[in-house]
A protein has these predicted regions:
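N-terminal start-of-chain detector that recognizes signal peptides
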Residues: 19-21, 79-82, 200-205
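A gly/proline- and charged-residue-enriched helix-loop-helix capping module
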Residues: 72-87
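C-terminus-biased signal that marks the final domain/tail of proteins
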Residues: 87-91, 100-103, 112, 136-237
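A contiguous strand-loop segment
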Residues: 1-71, 89-104, 109-116, 125-157, ...
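Conserved aromatic-histidine-acidic binding/catalytic patches
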Residues: 63, 76-80, 219, 223
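Short acidic, glycine/serine/threonine-rich loops at helix termini
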Residues: 120-122
Length: 237
């Protein structure tokens, strides 16, 4: 399970949390003293991360956590209480039946029993996609959802290049039997290929579109200007 976290605040840190429920390690902002985490793994092997989704339906106007984005609270609660991917679905069901969710998100989940699924969530509905049902056994998302609208005309802020580049890298690794943690860290997490750029060498000794020699614009690359932290979790059955 992997996520590049793209946010304006580059001061990020991991916390170890043990409040009497399931202990976990979670990613949050430096000096954050609220119960909000944006990726993590707990002591029983359940892990979660998310990305914003910009093509789903209506989000809730507010809920018991307030009026702001609730992805940090949802993931903190999941890490403290969930043991399996199915447990996370139960958590989402409880929110559907209550006040809903204020931020549309793609939640990637993973557990120690072999479960792996992506939940595309809007205010009062979600769509589950299991890795076991995917053609090659992996799931990739950026800032749009497969169950949402507009897939034939994806604007740049949805991250189409980031999605397509990561997807193609995973596909080539699976096809060549080279999908390893090292591949994800070295070839995917740090990838700087811009739109329509098949590959590149560093230092880059070429021209990309109208840029100066040796310059790759990194606003829409997998590892980009706003990438503030990385989350990755590997579990071997």
């Amino acid at each position: 399970l992997w996520k590049n976290r793209d946010v304006g605040n580059s001061n990020q840190e991991y916390h170890y949390v043990d409040d009497g429920r399931i202990p976990f390690i979670g990613l949050t902002y430096r000096n954050e003293d609220t119960f909000q985490y944006y990726a993590g793994v707990n002591a029983v092997g359940f892990a979660v991360e998310n990305s914003n989704s910009y093509n789903l339906g209506r989000a809730a106007g507010g809920n018991g956590w307030g009026w702001g984005d609730d992805d940090g609270e949802i993931q903190a609660l999941a890490l403290a209480t969930c043991r399996t991917v199915d447990d996370f679905q139960v958590l989402l069901d409880s929110l559907d039946n209550a006040e809903g969710r204020t931020l549309n998100s793609n939640y990637g989940t993973f557990d120690a029993f072999g479960g792996a699924a992506m939940f595309e969530t809007e205010g009062f509905e979600y769509f589950r996609h299991d890795a076991a049902d995917a053609p090659d056994g992996y799931l990739v998302r950026s800032n749009f959802s497969y169950s949402g609208d507009g897939l034939d005309n994806r604007p740049n802020y949805w991250g189409p290049n980031r999605h397509d580049r990561a997807f193609n890298l995973f596909k080539s690794a699976v096809d060549d039997n080279q999908l390893t943690p090292e591949f994800v860290i070295q070839r995917v997490m740090r990838n700087l290929a811009a739109t329509d750029m098949n590959d590149y060498d560093l230092p880059y000794r070429n021209f990309y579109e109208g840029n100066e020699f040796g310059v790759i614009p990194n606003g829409e690359t997998v590892c980009r200007a706003s990438t503030a932290s990385i989350f990755g979790y590997v579990f071997s059955l």
